[in-house]
């Protein structure tokens, strides 16, 4: 059976939710029995987002095979409950690098290398790569940015060519656009959408469906108008309203008939040629999850101490992991964002004294590091549940070395090259590397869990695999003194003996990890470390009277059908 391709473009403005739409559509098709994957093309010149400032880009999401990617891949994995790879995120910089490398190798036989055909052909190669594996029935391809952006034009040309080569029954274009409501006029305006589609048509692309992002329900008249002036059928004009939770969007799209629109086009004779594709999606698990999500029994406060908390997309996978970890136990986590720069001995009590747990987030650079160290100290001394991720683990070890081992000035060589007690040091294989991009310890590595440890109790396994993104590690030369003072290193890499997990056995829940468990949380399978941490925080919240009644989120959209909720 030939792989089908859905191309998702955007118009009028960025940040419309193409990633959430793609993930939600993928879930609707997956729940019909189809094998689906989603990829994203980013038009920027960076080879990957690994060296970009989180204020510019948000979180860098890491795949099993070590790709540093856009945060939308986190949405794809969480919604579809399956991993992505290097082939799921491609940038213009990567495309050009591949083409230039081929030219240097003589692959083009002396021809003049141009955008057409060479850059376009490289884009088409990556668009088809996942489908050619034979593992997927449907590949959804999201194009970053908006129609009309100069940097996006090669991608539109690649789609035009593929649509011609693969045929209309094997391709589909979904165009997301904004339908603004003008309060003064008291009506929804379609003109921006008309101009956006006109721009798409100028590139030789006729959208098959128009997805209308709006704060208000679009009327039948608005649908007819968009249908008439944008050359699509009325049933192909889909509204995608603002929702209380991104996890409601699959049901909102289901109610709009989005799944039927796709399968009727791709599989018109489902009973004969494709028994794998069912007529209706089985969303029972999703609906059960959403019921628990929207009806929690209690709310607990957890502090997220980080450097970039003003831009919450920088910690997107962590905040989503909190949400998903609480759902099975019907607990709503209220995240208190604490800028690590604001923490001092004078402010730490006011900032952390009213939370049920402290998570110290990953990061780079020395700004705010002392605040993170102070947060770890406060949690240890007050026996507040503590979870340190990547740099969070390193800060907890620095704090322990200073105040338990008595090593005054102990630090990481990332921040103090001359420290007398370099408890955190650059990994040996990193010392000869000068390039920044794509050179960290990236991707999935093994972690052997010590029997009898809290980590073993949580994982219920002797060996696990987790994703990494770091250059610095616990210094094994000083590690054994930390052990003597009561710290336990309950997880290590079996090949390199690098520390992966640290815990303090005498505390109620004090654990740090060098890897990033937030990258392995999905709707169907919240990460066990986050689940255990949230449970420990819930127990502490009950002891300290920090539990509150759940606060309903501000209602921004029509409620879901009562048959679901």
Curated annotation (Swiss-Prot):
GO MF assignments = ATP binding; CTP synthase activity; glutaminase activity; identical protein binding; metal ion binding
- Report the residue ranges that make up the Glutamine amidotransferase type-1 domain in this protein: 301-543
What are the binding positions for CTP in this chain? 14, 149-151, 189-194, 225
| EC number, UniProt record | 6.3.4.2
Top-level taxonomic group: Bacteria
Q: Which residues lie within the region annotated Amidoligase domain?
A: 1-268
In terms of SUPFAM superfamilies, this protein maps to: Class I glutamine amidotransferase-like (SSF52317), P-loop containing nucleoside triphosphate hydrolases (SSF52540)
Question: Disordered: where is this region?
Answer: 545-565
Pathway(s) annotated for this protein in UniProt: Pyrimidine metabolism; CTP biosynthesis via de novo pathway; CTP from UDP: step 2/2
List ligand-binding residues for UTP. Answer: 14, 189-194, 225
Question: Which GO BP terms sit in this record?
Answer: 'de novo' CTP biosynthetic process; pyrimidine nucleobase biosynthetic process
Q: Which UniProt keywords apply?
A: ATP-binding, Glutamine amidotransferase, Ligase, Magnesium, Metal-binding, Nucleotide-binding, Pyrimidine biosynthesis
Q: Where does Mg(2+) bind?
A: 72, 142
| Reaction(s) the record says it catalyses | UTP + L-glutamine + ATP + H2O = CTP + L-glutamate + ADP + phosphate + 2 H(+); L-glutamine + H2O = L-glutamate + NH4(+); UTP + NH4(+) + ATP = CTP + ADP + phosphate + 2 H(+)
Task: Give the residues annotated as active site.
Answer: 390, 516, 518
The UniProt record gives the binding positions of ATP as 15-20, 72
Q: How does it assemble?
A: Homotetramer.
* Main function: Catalyzes the ATP-dependent amination of UTP to CTP with either L-glutamine or ammonia as the source of nitrogen. Regulates intracellular CTP levels through interactions with the four ribonucleotide triphosphates.
Q: What is this protein called?
A: CTP synthase
Q: What is the name of the gene encoding this protein? A: pyrG
């Amino acid at each position: 059976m030939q792989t089908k391709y859905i191309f998702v473009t955007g118009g009028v403005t960025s940040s419309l939710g193409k990633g959430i739409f793609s993930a939600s559509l993928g879930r609707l098709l997956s729940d019909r029995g189809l094998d689906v994957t989603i990829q994203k093309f980013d038009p920027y010149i960076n080879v990957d987002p690994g060296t970009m400032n989180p204020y510019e880009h948000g979180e860098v999401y890491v795949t099993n095979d070590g790709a540093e990617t856009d945060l939308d891949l986190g949405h794809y994995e969480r919604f579809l409950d399956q991993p992505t790879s290097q082939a799921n995120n491609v940038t213009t910089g990567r495309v050009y690098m591949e083409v230039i490398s081929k030219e240097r190798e003589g692959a083009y036989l002396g021809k003049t290398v141009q955008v057409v055909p060479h850059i376009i052909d490289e884009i088409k190669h990556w668009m088809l790569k996942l489908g050619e594996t034979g593992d997927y029935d449907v590949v959804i391809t999201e194009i970053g940015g908006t129609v009309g952006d100069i940097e996006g034009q090669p991608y539109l040309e690649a789609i035009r060519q593929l649509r011609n080569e693969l045929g209309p029954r094997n391709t589909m274009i979904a165009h997301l656009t904004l339908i603004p409501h003008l309060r003064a006029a008291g009506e929804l305006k379609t003109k921006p959408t008309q101009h956006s589609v006109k721009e798409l048509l100028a590139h030789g692309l006729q959208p098959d469906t128009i997805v209308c992002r709006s704060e208000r329900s679009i009327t039948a008249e608005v649908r007819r108008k968009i249908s008439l002036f944008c050359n699509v059928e009325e049933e192909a004009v889909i509204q995608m309203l603002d929702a209380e939770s991104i996890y409601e969007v699959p049901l909102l799209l289901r109610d709009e008939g989005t799944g039927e629109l796709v399968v009727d086009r791709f599989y018109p004779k489902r009973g004969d040629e494709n028994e794998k594709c069912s007529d209706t999606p089985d969303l029972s698990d999703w609906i059960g999850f959403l019921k628990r999500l929207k009806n929690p029994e209690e709310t607990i406060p957890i502090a997220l101490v980080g450097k970039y908390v003003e831009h919450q997309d920088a910690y997107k996978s962590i905040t989503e992991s909190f949400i998903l970890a609480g759902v099975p136990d019907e607990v709503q986590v209220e995240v208190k964002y604490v800028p690590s720069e604001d923490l001092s001995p004078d402010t730490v009590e006011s900032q952390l004294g009213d939370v049920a747990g402290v998570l110290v987030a990953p990061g780079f650079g020395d700004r705010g590091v002392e605040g993170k160290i102070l947060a770890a100290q406060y949690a240890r001394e007050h026996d507040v549940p503590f979870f340190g991720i990547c740099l969070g683990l390193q800060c907890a070890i620095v704090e322990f070395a200073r105040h338990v081992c008595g090593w005054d000035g102990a630090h990481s060589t990332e921040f103090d090259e001359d420290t007398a007690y370099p408890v955190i040091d650059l990994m040996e294989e990193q010392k000869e590397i000068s390039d920044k991009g794509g050179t960290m310890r990236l991707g999935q590595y093994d972690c052997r869990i010590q029997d009898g440890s809290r980590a073993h109790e949580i994982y219920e396994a002797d060996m696990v695999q987790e994703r990494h993104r770091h250059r610095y590690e616990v210094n094994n030369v000083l590690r054994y003194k930390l052990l003597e003072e009561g710290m336990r290193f309950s997880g290590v890499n079996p090949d390199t003996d690098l520390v992966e997990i640290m815990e303090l056995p005498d505390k109620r829940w004090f654990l740090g990890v060098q890897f990033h468990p937030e990258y392995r949380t999905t709707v169907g399978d919240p990460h066990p470390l986050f689940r255990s941490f949230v449970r420990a925080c819930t127990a502490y919240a009950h002891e300290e009277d920090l539990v509150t009644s759940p606060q309903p989120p501000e209602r921004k959209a029509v409620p879901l059908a009562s048959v679901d909720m």
